[in-house]
């Protein structure tokens, strides 16, 4: 039974374009299915989490990460008697707007777009789901419920100060109450993202030999798990050891999140979702001790993994690809597919830049590499191939 402060699908604020609900799914289950069936969701399997897609079959990509986040979000929401369907759905959609090549790709595209109001993957997720996906005859986008869109756009909390152009534009027709906190389910999805990525980036980084178990001594609380497991299982393999460490880490983080959130709910005597949205802090949270550990772990990953020689070298190449593609399309829009070129307002540089950014952001790693090799290479064979495939 849902708590009184849960997001009840029967009491949803509905969709921008009115629809008759189905009898066999609730509104949030319907949204989950719509997201899974988008082209953008399928493309996530070929988009970088930390390691480029072709570097290894077992490294996580944006799709596997999103699935892992959704399982954590669903479990936490279910334990708190919240809508597990809503938490799962928001988690599945939270990375849809990411560029190829992960954060390196986003930084590169944002730099290209600095004269055209920049680029934000969070705003791009909203744009994909409300405009760019073309699946229905009656409207653009996939017409999700208010609660799902709110949860996606407030992934990092209330939006104050300068508001992204597309978010502001969409908000005029469907007010997402940007200045308030999102539902408890959306807050769960956000912290499930933190739990998943810090745990699994550690695992993948050890698998890629960017860091080793000795490096984890910098993180005392994780090193303690390593020590205990080695003491208990004398001949444990390295691969099994990191799996067990990640398992313990995730259990600790989830247990802590549940405990602190229950404390917050009881302290505030929350009885409805309105109170959650209008608190002056996020109701779903870790303890202060665990928040400090998460910050420490993020700093460790940033310094030892994301800024490592291997990742930095790859990031430089990825930056070159994104910026190179942006330049060639800006120089000649005829290199764009016809259906994308038609979206550009004639002789409007701003419109051209925005359409090109949308096109590049939707690329997978491998398509961006292929496109760069064909459009930015002087190899004569690529020029001949270009004539057949793109003109």
Curated annotation (Swiss-Prot):
**PROSITE patterns in UniProt:** HD
Q: Which Pfam families match?
A: HD, HD_assoc
Q: Which CDD domains match?
A: HDc
Instruction: Please report the stretch or stretches of sequence annotated as the HD domain.
Output: 62-198
Q: Does the keyword Hydrolase apply?
A: yes
Single GO molecular function: dGTPase activity
Q: Which GO terms describe its biological process?
A: dGTP catabolic process
Query: Keywords on this record?
Result: Hydrolase
Q: Which domain of life does this protein belong to?
A: Bacteria
SMART domains attached to this UniProt entry = HDc (SM00471)
HAMAP family per UniProt: dGTPase_type2 (MF_01212)
Give the similarity note.
Belongs to the dGTPase family. Type 2 subfamily.
Name of the protein: Deoxyguanosinetriphosphate triphosphohydrolase-like protein
